[in-house]
């Protein structure tokens, strides 16, 4: 492994020991990595771990003094100050340092034994309501120790010059071959290997056997330990929808009932957890706290809510990096879970998702690597309704980022209501080896599909909504498409306006749940075949597409399709603290702008469209005046019904 992006070793280790009470995860942290934000925050995860129900992380901070070309901060801190720092973080540091390689091995072995003994004592004596102080090791060695001391009269060992490739041997530098050979011979290979180049038997005997070998530890190949979740029938958690739009429900709140019972059904297995940066209640997962608590091993006060030394929710550390890192460690060691986040702030872990996608890509080519549970994201508190928050909280770009990853790895779902959300979540939490992204509403919203129809719709991934379409048996004049909860409402409202004004106008209404259905089947396994796509979207009719995110993403996904008469409305990077409907108006996703745009491409209407066009423009002016005076949306917007 060439290393690369740093900062997550400790959070991975802490995720690995969750619900693994007999596991000790020794985690080597380079002093360069220790300077990253995520790693610096990770030292405090010892306040989350419960030594009665979880394993123990043994950090080994390796101070070799240098990064690529600079000294490291931790190596230039006086030792007494360094020890105080880690004691302040709740650790008991042991410093290991020696001037000879033989001595360092002896000291390190002795210190490891001492740390293991200390961990065993902690495990045996810890009481439920008292946080323990865990051991850690600070290992000091010169950078490049054992390598060439000088090259071209410049010191290498013990300096930044020993980073990565200290000796370049190629046709431009043949003189360095002797230096390289001397370095390799310093390890005395003749004492290690026989004449056939095989490791000597007496040395082989020293190596651990079976699962005691690092690479054979089942925790390093988590699929070996994976147990399927006990999942209740999700159909029993749907909301009743007799007629589209009549029922009002909060999608994330209702999903919480389903997740609550997954927690209850797997309490004995202890293999399912929820991760999020202090947002479980904000994202309306309230009902999970009927079954569990937030895990917290720090000081607790009487007015704390849902805080306990043991709980299935990791929600008490305000760091997307740490929540994502712990979830990845939890999944990689054979368990299940998901991370939920404000949509805008999941961008903080963009690159972490990329690294996990790369890992999944490589593992697909390794037959010995067993399947693990998918990395599941739920994005809520999203761009279209921020209440007291504003422009800083508005960014749907995680979807653009995820789409760039390998097609056999990523999936994106935009359920328009409660029943489709529950169906999507059930699918994602059962899946393996994917990165699944669900974008979900948390506010009270109209409900469109009963559970039976929701299952069919999610299974297909997209489809024509009969109740909103009137093109039975003929080609439509207009395709009104949408993806996302808010765009669905506005697209339906626009459709209603058009149909009320032009009864002979044929509109086909299409809702997209699985965003990857829009891509060509050549590019993504979920993509529709061209014939299917053309049958649904037509080859040439105008398409008004109301989209949750940035409009360019829809154009990117559909650029190979025959019908390029596509006009996408989505987030245009306009926003502030304002009303819900005004957010849509500012970004031209509202019903009036959708109608105005549709009229441009409906040639059959001729001059008849002028009056409606003017009416919509006047409505937009009326809207601005109303919210300026009353600070809320017009009654006809707030009380709109299908």
Provide a role label for each language-model segment.
Residues 1-26, 35, 41-450, ...:
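Thiamine diphosphate
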Residues 33-35, 142-145, 278-282, 319-320, ...:
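Gly/Ser/Thr-rich loops at beta-strand to alpha-helix junctions
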């Amino acid at each position: 492994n060439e290393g690369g992006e740093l900062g997550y070793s400790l959070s991975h280790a802490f995720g690995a020991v969750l619900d693994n009470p007999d596991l000790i995860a020794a985690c080597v942290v380079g002093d360069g990595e220790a300077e990253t934000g995520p790693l610096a925050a990770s030292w405090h995860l010892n306040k989350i771990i419960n030594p009665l129900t979880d394993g123990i992380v043994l950090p080994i901070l390796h101070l070799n003094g240098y990064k690529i070309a600079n000294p490291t901060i931790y190596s230039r801190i006086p030792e007494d100050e360094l020890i105080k720092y880690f004691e302040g973080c709740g650790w008991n540091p042991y410093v290991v340092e020696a001037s000879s390689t033989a001595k360092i091995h002896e000291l390190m072995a002795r210190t490891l034994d001492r740390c293991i003994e200390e961990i065993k004592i902690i495990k045996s004596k810890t009481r439920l309501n008292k946080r323990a102080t865990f051991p850690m090791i600070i290992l000091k060695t010169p950078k490049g120790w054992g390598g060439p001391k000088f090259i071209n009269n410049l010191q290498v060992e013990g300096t930044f010059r020993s980073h990565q490739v200290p000796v370049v041997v190629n046709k431009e530098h043949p003189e360095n071959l002797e230096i390289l050979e001397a370095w390799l011979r310093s390890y005395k290979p003749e004492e290690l290997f026989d004449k056939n180049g095989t490791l000597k038997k007496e040395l082989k005997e020293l190596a651990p056997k079976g699962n005691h070998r690092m690479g054979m530890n089942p925790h390093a190949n988590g699929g070996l330990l994976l147990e399927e979740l006990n999942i209740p029938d999700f159909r029993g958690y749907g909301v009743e929808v007799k007629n589209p739009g009549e029922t009002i429900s909060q999608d994330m709140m209702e999903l919480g009932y389903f997740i609550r019972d997954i927690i209850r059904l797997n309490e004995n297995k202890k293999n399912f957890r929820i991760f999020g940066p202090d947002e479980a209640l904000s994202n309306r997962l309230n009902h999970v706290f009927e079954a569990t608590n937030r895990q917290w091993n720090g000081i607790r006060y009487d007015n704390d809510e849902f805080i306990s030394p043991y709980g299935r929710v990791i929600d008490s550390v305000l760091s997307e990096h740490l929540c994502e890192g712990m979830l990845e460690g939890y999944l990689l060691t054979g368990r299940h879970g998901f991370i939920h986040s404000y949509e805008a702030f999941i961008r903080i872990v963009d690159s972490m998702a990329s690294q996990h996608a790369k890992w999944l890509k490589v593992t697909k080519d390794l037959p010995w690597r067993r399947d693990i549970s998918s990395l599941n994201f739920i994005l809520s508190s999203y761009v279209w309704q921020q209440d007291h928050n504003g422009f800083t909280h508005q960014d749907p770009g995680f979807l653009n980022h995820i789409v760039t990853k390998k097609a056999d790895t990523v999936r994106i779902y935009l359920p328009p209501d409660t029943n489709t959300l529950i169906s999507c979540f059930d699918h994602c939490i059962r899946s393996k080896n994917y990165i699944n992204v669900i974008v979900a509403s948390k506010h009270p919203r109209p409900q469109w599909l009963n559970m039976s129809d929701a299952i069919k719709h999610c299974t297909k991934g997209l489809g024509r909504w009969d109740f909103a379409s009137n093109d039975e048996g003929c080609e439509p004049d207009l395709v009104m498409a949408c993806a996302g909860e808010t765009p669905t409402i506005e697209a339906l409202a626009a459709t209603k306006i058009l149909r009320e004004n032009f009864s002979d106008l044929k509109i086909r209404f299409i809702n997209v749940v699985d965003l990857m259905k829009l891509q060509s089947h050549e590019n993504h396994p979920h993509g529709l075949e061209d014939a299917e796509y053309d049958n649904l979207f037509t080859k040439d009719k105008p398409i008004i597409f109301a989209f949750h995110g940035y409009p360019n993403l829809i154009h990117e996904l559909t650029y190979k399709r025959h019908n390029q008469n596509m006009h996408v409305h989505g987030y245009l990077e306009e926003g502030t603290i304002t009303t819900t409907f005004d957010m849509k108006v500012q970004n031209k996703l509202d019903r009036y702008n959708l109608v105005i745009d549709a009229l441009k491409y409906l040639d059959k209407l001729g001059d008849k469209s002028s009056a409606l066009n003017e009416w919509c423009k006047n409505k937009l002016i009326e809207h601005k005046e109303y919210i300026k005076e009353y600070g809320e949306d017009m009654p006809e917007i707030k009380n709109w019904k299908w």
